[in-house]
């Protein structure tokens, strides 16, 4: 199965329209360009967890609005999204679904409002993706995606995570790479 992991740059403060409207803070544009240029560690970790019988494609989508043609040849598309770009992520998911390609979505926004996200995809991952990723792949292969994969409560030990699949990146496109030492908030708020 050909699996596409789509990373959407998270901060759009370099968007010409936003800048024209004056929606910026001094220095924030420069910092946001750096943040937006970082690869998705979550998706790269899922790539590292993907069994070898699947072919993984990590695709950076800097601006889904400018994407005229969808990357094709994929049997499953996984999109991780923050709230800042969720509408663009939904539009991209809708386009893939219209092309008949199953879509699974995850990330902080999707975990917060899965009932909203499921309207745009075949399955959502609530919580961390690592514990259920292989089940998502198996279910997609069998043509029976569960709809909601709930990986809560958070009990994933980051020390069990493989090294993210940095080999999928063209390192020359990034001015830095990040390392995870911890993840999420340690408090268990209701």
Q: What name fits each language-model region?
A:
Residues 1-190:
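Acidic, low-complexity intrinsically disordered segments
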């Amino acid at each position: 199965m050909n699996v596409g992991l789509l990373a959407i740059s998270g901060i759009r403060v370099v968007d010409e329209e936003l800048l024209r409207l004056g929606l910026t803070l001094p220095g924030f544009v420069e910092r946001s360009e750096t943040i937006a240029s970082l690869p998705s560690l979550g998706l790269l970790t899922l790539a590292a967890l993907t069994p070898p019988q699947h072919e993984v494609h990590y695709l950076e989508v800097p601006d889904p609005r400018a994407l005229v043609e969808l990357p094709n040849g994929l049997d499953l598309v996984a999109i991780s999204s923050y709230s800042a770009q969720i509408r663009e992520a939904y539009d991209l998911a809708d386009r893939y679904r219209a092309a008949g390609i199953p879509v699974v979505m995850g990330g902080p926004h999707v975990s917060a409002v899965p009932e909203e996200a499921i309207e745009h995809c075949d399955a959502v991952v609530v919580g961390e993706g690592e514990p259920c990723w292989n089940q998502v792949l198996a279910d997609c292969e069998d043509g029976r995606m569960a709809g909601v994969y709930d990986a809560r409560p958070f009990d994933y030990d980051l020390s069990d995570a493989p090294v993210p699949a940095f080999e999928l990146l063209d390192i020359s496109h990034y001015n830095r790479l990040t390392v995870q030492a911890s993840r999420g908030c340690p408090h268990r708020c209701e």
